[in-house]
Structures are given as structure tokens and as C-alpha cells.
Amino acid sequence: MPGAGLIKPNHADCGAFFIYDPVKKAVGLAHSGWKGTLGRIGANVVRLMQRCYGSDPKDMIASTSPAICKNCYEVDAPLAERFDDEFGAGVCTSPGREGHAWLDLEAAQAIQLIEAGLKCENITLMEKCTFEDEEHLFSHRRDTAKLGGTGDMAAYIRIV
């Protein structure tokens, strides 16, 4: 419906999924930090759009928001193992500190959208790191201790 929109406040290093179905004129939006990504929130939004709007994943267009990148997102070994088990080896790369690995959250997000039926060419990964872009983006990992508090970003999608 033109003019309809969704807003998702409160994400920082976590990403957001933006999903649009131009055929059914439907949108979906979800917060996708490590918990949501591991729980396949993107695929869940695709299924919800199928059920509620009759959307076909092949028609959907998806994008991710800025999020912490694979060069800056260090997680502990047990979490890295869960991601590799869920999405395949390579989502977590060479260990950082002992007992840790680097997590490619965007790769896991893309994998679940492709497995849910979206075409690769209809998925755009923002590839803008919240941790690295200090001038423009808030990063929970980078800024919370430095600022003595917290900050957030909001995501919004609207049919015009």
C-alpha cells in the first residue's frame, strides 16, 4: 500500500534487513544482530511475506543496512562454531585472539536470503562497516565505552 512504512529503531553494529516485493507492493524490515541472524530472521520475514501478502521470493528485492564487518566483529569460538554449523564453514574466518574468530554477519544474512528463494542479483549488501566509519556511523563496540553511554541508529522502509 503506497505510503505504508515500517521503522526499526535501536540497532548499531547489528544490521537490518530491508525486503521489498514490487509485485505485491509489500515491505519487510527486521533487526538482524547475531541472535537474529543465527535464528534466520531474514528467512522468517520472507516466509511471513509469503504467508501474509502472497509474495514470491523470486520477486523480492533485499538489502542490508550498515553493520559491523567481518574485519571488526570478533566473537568467541563457541558462537563461531554455531555460525559455521548453521551457514557453512567460512562464515567465521581465521581466529583473532585465542579462542575467538571473525564473524561475517553479512555473508550469513545473504546465505539465508538465497536459501529462502531470493535471487542473488536481487540482494544488495551494504558493505559499510559501523565500526570503521567513525565519522558517519555509531558503533556499539567502538563508542559505548568512549561516550559513556549508548547510541543507536534507526532503519525505515516505505512504499511510495
Show which residues each predicted segment covers:
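Active-site microenvironment for binding and transforming phosphate-containing groups
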Residues: M1-V160
